Amino acid sequence: MAPHSVKSQFGSRLRQLRDERGYSQEELAERAGLLRNYVGGVERGERNVALENIVKLAKALSVTPGDLFSDFSR
């Protein structure tokens, strides 16, 4: 996988926001109604995230879905 793929950039941003809030992957997963290994896969850029799950993750982090894309390279 390319180091700057959309999935890896999204995963890095998700990890950054999770770390800023002091959440573990397990805590974020629970707040979002997802599985911990799913969240881990997203953070590693291994998962293609459905729109519904982007919204769930954003709500769990108290951000907008757009905030999950704010640090993307062009």
Listing of model-derived features with the role each one plays in the protein:
Residues 33-47, 73:
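Recognition helix of helix-turn-helix/homeodomain-like DNA-binding domains
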Residues 52-67:
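DNA major-groove recognition helix of helix-turn-helix/homeodomain DNA-binding modules
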Residues 2, 59, 69-74:
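Short, charged recognition helix plus adjacent turn
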Residues 12-27, 31:
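Short basic helix-loop element that most often maps to the first helix and adjoining turn
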Residues 1-9:
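A detector for short, charged/polar N-terminal pre-domain segments
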Residues 24, 35-38, 50, 64:
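Short coil turns linking two alpha-helices in DNA-binding domains
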Residues 14, 28-29, 39-42, 68:
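Conserved hydrophobic/aromatic packing and binding residues within compact polymer-binding modules
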